[in-house]
């Protein structure tokens, strides 16, 4: 009888171990499938006049998680609005777009940019005048640089604008 209890406990322990192994294995496979469907989060940084005016066209796009206003491209670390407004810091008012590249492409974002700026006006945008309002594309990697250049070239060849495209393509620095 004592042996029956020992066998019973051994079988019970083996069954419990198998149960934990099965549960652990299925939760691992869930992790793997989750990681393959995780969003591919990236950043795009554009300047095109007043940053508050640049936010709305991008904020409601599918795949865009947030749009942040800020400054880029200048000499001074952490400038404030008044300093940038003087034009003395060489910063540009810009937006940083956080997006899921599996839901929206960088090219799609470039198309939205071109539709919302005057790419031929290198000294400001619309009523916003001064170098702090100049249009620019700030690339974060070689792919973005290449896509931005191709997109700008395509726009130039389209002859949509009489004047030369003045939008610069610049390596992104601290935002």
What is the meaning of each model-derived region?
Residues 2-175:
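Flexible coil/turn and secondary-structure edge motifs
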């Amino acid at each position: 009888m004592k042996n029956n209890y020992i066998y019973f406990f051994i079988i019970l322990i083996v069954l419990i171990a198998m149960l934990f192994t099965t549960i652990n294995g299925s939760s691992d496979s869930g992790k793997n499938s989750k990681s393959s469907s995780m969003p591919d989060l990236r950043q795009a940084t554009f300047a095109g006049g007043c940053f508050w005016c640049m936010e709305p066209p991008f904020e409601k796009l599918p795949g865009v998680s947030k749009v942040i206003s800020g400054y880029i491209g200048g000499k001074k670390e952490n400038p404030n609005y008044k300093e940038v407004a003087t034009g003395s810091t060489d910063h540009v008012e810009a937006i940083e777009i956080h997006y899921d590249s599996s839901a929206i492409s960088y090219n799609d974002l470039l198309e939205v940019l071109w539709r919302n700026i005057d790419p031929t006006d290198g000294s400001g945008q619309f009523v916003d005048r001064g170098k702090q309002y100049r249009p620019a594309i700030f690339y974060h990697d070689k792919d973005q640089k290449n896509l931005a250049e191709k997109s700008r070239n395509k726009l130039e060849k389209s002859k949509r604008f009489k004047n030369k495209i003045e939008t610069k393509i610049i390596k992104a620095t601290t935002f």
